[in-house]
C-alpha cells in the first residue's frame, strides 16, 4: 500500500507488505554445500530466494551463490604487497567498482548497478533518516549540555551543590542509561524502531520538563537518572538503523550528520542558556536555568518525538515508511544484498535471548572484544564532554555568566569542522583508519598541553579548541562496528548494545575518578587519563583494521572477488573454469549457468 491510498493507514506508519515478501524475507544464512570452504578460503552467506537488481528486475540466484548481475575479479594473492594491509577496501570491493567510482561522487558513490532511482532513494533517505537523526542527536545534546550550562548559571548555588556533586550527578545519570539499554537486546530485532524511539523520547521529554522544578539535589538526580534511562536507546538504535540503509562507503558521512547534531547541541545549549538567562531570569519567579529545561522539553524534545513516529522507516525488510514507494523499498533490499547486509529475521526464527549458542556467537568472536576495547577507549578519551573548558572559563573572574555561556560554544563550533573532515574524508578516500589515527594524535597533543598547564595563553586556547578531536572520528568507529556486524541482525542488536553498554559503564566511573570537580579547573588527572586512552585508541586502530580485513577476506566472494594463492600451490577454483567466462578482464556467470 502506498501513501496515495486514502484509507487511514495511509496517514500512519504501517508495515509495507510487498507481493514478493513471502519469498524474499528472512532466508537462513547457511554456507553453500557446492563450493568447498577450503577451496574458496571464505564463508559464503546463502542468498535469499529472489534477487532484485537496482532496476528491480528479479533474477534467479545461481546455485553456487554467484550472481548474474555482478562482474567478478579473480585475484591471485601471490606476491601481495605489504602495504596492501593499509588498503581498507582491499577485500570489500573489487577493481571494477573502484574503476567505476568517481571521486567527486563520494556522497552517492557510482556503481554500474546504480540507477537514477537508486540515487533518488538515497536523496530520500538523507532527508527522512539522516536529517532526522541529526535533529534527534541535537535535541539530546541540547539537554545534556544544558546540565553543564545550568550548573554555571546558578543551579549550583540554587541546589546547594558542593564538591563533586556535579560529576556524581552525571555518573548517576549514566548508570540509568546503561542499565536500561540492556532490554533492547531483546526489543530491537523484534519491535519496530518507529515505535521504540518515539516512545522513549516522550519519556525523555517528560523528565526534561520535570528538571525545571527540582528543588533539591536528590530530586534533580532522580530526574536525571530516569531521563537518561529513557535516552538509553537512541545511540545504539539510531546506528543500527543507519547501518541497515547505507552502504559502507556512504555511512560515514551520514553518521557525521548525527555527530554534527551533537556539536550543534553543544553550541545552541550555551547560546540559548545565555539568552534565556539574560531575558527570562526571574520571570514568574523562575531562575534562568529552570526556563531552559522548560523550553528544551516543550519546544525541542516533544516535537522531535512526534516527528520520529512518522519518519523513522524501520529497516528495508520490515519497512514502515510513509514516504518510500514499493520500488524504492525493493531497491533498498537489493542494495543490502549487494553489500551483504542482512537487516531482518522473522520473529519465529530468532533464537531465545537466553540461548547459549546465541551468546557464544557474540562473545566467542574475536571482533567483539576488539571492538569493546576500541569503543571503551573512544568513550574515555573524550575531553570534549568533560566540561573542563566551561569550568575553566567560570574560574576566570573576568568573564560574566553570559560571557561564559557564549564562549563555551567555541570548541563545539570547531567540532563541526573536525567531524566533517574525518567523516567525509573517510567516505571520499574509502579509508577510515587514517582519520582515526590523525584525530587520536591531535587529541593526545591537546591533552599533553593541558597536563603541563603552565603554558602560554595562546597554547592553552589552542589546546582547548582542539579537544573536539577526541570525538571527531566517532562516525568512523561506528561505521566499522556496523560493517563488522552486518551479517546477522540478532547478533548485531545484542553486540551493539553489549559494546555500547560496557563502554558506557566504564564512562560511568572513570570520569568520577579522573575528573573530580574539586580539581577544577586544571584536571591534571583527567587530561592524563584522556591522553592514555587516546594513545591506545590510535594504536588500537591498526588491530581493528587487521580483524576487519580478515573478516572481509572471508566474505570476499560476496563482494565480487574470487581469491586463490598460487604460492601455496592453489589453482583457479574449478567452478570458475566450469561456470564462468571472462569478458574485458572480469569473470561473469555463463548465460546458460
Swiss-Prot record:
Major location (coarse): membrane
Keywords from the named record: Biotin, Cell membrane, Membrane, Phosphoprotein, Symport, Transmembrane, Transmembrane helix, Transport
Pfam families assigned to the protein according to its UniProt record, in alphabetical order: MFS_1
GO BP term, pick one: biotin transport
Presence of keyword Membrane: yes
UniProt topological domain (Extracellular) ranges: 1-121, 188-190, 246-291, 383-408, 454-460, 514-526
Superkingdom, natural source: Eukaryota
InterPro entries per record: MFS (IPR011701), MFS_trans_sf (IPR036259)
Transmembrane region(s): 122-142, 167-187, 191-211, 225-245, 292-312, 362-382, 409-429, 433-453, 461-481, 493-513, 527-547
Localisation: Cell membrane
UniProt topology in membrane: Multi-pass membrane protein
Topological domain ranges for the Cytoplasmic compartment: 143-166, 212-224, 313-361, 430-432, 482-492, 548-593
Keyword Isomerase listed: no
GO molecular function annotation: biotin transmembrane transporter activity; symporter activity; transmembrane transporter activity
Gene3D superfamilies, per the entry: MFS general substrate transporter like domains
PANTHER family: PERMEASE-RELATED, VITAMIN H TRANSPORTER
Function statement: Involved in uptake of biotin with the concomitant entry of protons.
Family per record: Belongs to the major facilitator superfamily. Allantoate permease family.
Protein name: Vitamin H transporter
UniProt source species: Saccharomyces cerevisiae (strain ATCC 204508 / S288c)
Amino acid at each position: 500500500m502506498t501513501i496515495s491510498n486514502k484509507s487511514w493507514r495511509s496517514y500512519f506508519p504501517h508495515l509495507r507488505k510487498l507481493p514478493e515478501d513471502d519469498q524474499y524475507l528472512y532466508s537462513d544464512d547457511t554456507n553453500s554445500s557446492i563450493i568447498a570452504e577450503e577451496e574458496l578460503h571464505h564463508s559464503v552467506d546463502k542468498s535469499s530466494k529472489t534477487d532484485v537488481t537496482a532496476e528491480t528486475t528479479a533474477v534467479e540466484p545461481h546455485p553456487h551463490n554467484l550472481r548474474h548481475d555482478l562482474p567478478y575479479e579473480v585475484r591471485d594473492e601471490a606476491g601481495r604487497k605489504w602495504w596492501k594491509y593499509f588498503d581498507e577496501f582491499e577485500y570489500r570491493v573489487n577493481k571494477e567498482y573502484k574503476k567505476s567510482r568517481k571521486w567527486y561522487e563520494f556522497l552517492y558513490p557510482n556503481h554500474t548497478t546504480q540507477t537514477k532511482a537508486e540515487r533518488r532513494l538515497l536523496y530520500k533517505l538523507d532527508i527522512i533518516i539522516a536529517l532526522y537523526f541529526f535533529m534527534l542527536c541535537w535535541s539530546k545534546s541540547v539537554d545534556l549540555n544544558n546540565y553543564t550550562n545550568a550548573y554555571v548559571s546558578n543551579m549550583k548555588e540554587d541546589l546547594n551543590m558542593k564538591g563533586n556533586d556535579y560529576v556524581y550527578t552525571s555518573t548517576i545519570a549514566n548508570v540509568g542509561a546503561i542499565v536500561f539499554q540492556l532490554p533492547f537486546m531483546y526489543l530491537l530485532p523484534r519491535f519496530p524502531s518507529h515505535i521504540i524511539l518515539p516512545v522513549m523520547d516522550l519519556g525523555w521529554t517528560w523528565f526534561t520538563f520535570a528538571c525545571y522544578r527540582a528543588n533539591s539535589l536528590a530530586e534533580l538526580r532522580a530526574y536525571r537518572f530516569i531521563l537518561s534511562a529513557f535516552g538509553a536507546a537512541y545511540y545504539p538504535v539510531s546506528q543500527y538503523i543507519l547501518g541497515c540503509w547505507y552502504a559502507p562507503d556512504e555511512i560515514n558521512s551520514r553518521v557525521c550528520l548525527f555527530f554534527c547534531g551533537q556539536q550543534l547541541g553543544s553550541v545552541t545549549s550555551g547560546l540559548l542558556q545565555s539568552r534565556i538567562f539574560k531575558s527570562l531570569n526571574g520571570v514568574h519567579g523562575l531562575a534562568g536555568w529552570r526556563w531552559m529545561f522548560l523550553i528544551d522539553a516543550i519546544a525541542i524534545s516533544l516535537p522531535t518525538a512526534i516527528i520520529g513516529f512518522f519518519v523513522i522507516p524501520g529497516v528495508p525488510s520490515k519497512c514502515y515508511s510513509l514516504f518510500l514507494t514499493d520500488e524504492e523499498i525493493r531497491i533498498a533490499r537489493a542494495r543490502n544484498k549487494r553489500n551483504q547486509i542482512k537487516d531482518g529475521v522473522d520473529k519465529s526464527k530468532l533464537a531465545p535471548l537466553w540461548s547459549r549458542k546465541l551468546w557464544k556467537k557474540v562473545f566467542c568472536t574475536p571482533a567483539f572484544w576488539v571492538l569493546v576495547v576500541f569503543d571503551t577507549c573512544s568513550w574515555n578519551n573524550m575531553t570534549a564532554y568533560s566540561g573542563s573548558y566551561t569550568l575553566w572559563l567560570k574560574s576566570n573572574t573576568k568573564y560574566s555568566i553570559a560571557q561564559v555561556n557564549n564562549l563555551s560554544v567555541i570548541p563545539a563550533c570547531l567540532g563541526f569542522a573536525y567531524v566533517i573532515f574525518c567523516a567525509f574524508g573517510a567516505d571520499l578516500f574509502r579509508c577510515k583508519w587514517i582519520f582515526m589515527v590523525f584525530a587520536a594524535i591531535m587529541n593526545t597533543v591537546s591533552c599533553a598541553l593541558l597536563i603541563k598547564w603552565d603554558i602560554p595563553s595562546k597554547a592553552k586556547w589552542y589546546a582547548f579548541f582542539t579537544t573536539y578531536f577526541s570525538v571527531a572520528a566517532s562516525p568512523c568507529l561506528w561505521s566499522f562496528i556496523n560493517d563488522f556486524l552486518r551479517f546477522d541482525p540478532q547478533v548485531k542488536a545484542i553486540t551493539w548494545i553489549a559494546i555500547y553498554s560496557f563502554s558506557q559503564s566504564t564512562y560511568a566511573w572513570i570520569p568520577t575518578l579522573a575528573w573530580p570537580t574539586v580539581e577544577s579547573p586544571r584536571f591534571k588527572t583527567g587530561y592524563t587519563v584522556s591522553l592514555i586512552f587516546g594513545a591506545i585508541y590510535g594504536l588500537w586502530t591498526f588491530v581493528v583494521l587487521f580483524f576487519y580485513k580478515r573478516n572481509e577476506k572471508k566474505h570476499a566472494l560476496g563482494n565480487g572477488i574470487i581469491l586463490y594463492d598460487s604460492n601455496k600451490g592453489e589453482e583457479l577454483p574449478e567452478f570458475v573454469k566450469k561456470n564462468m567466462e571472462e569478458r574485458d578482464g572480469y569473470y561473469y556467470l555463463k548465460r546458460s549457468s
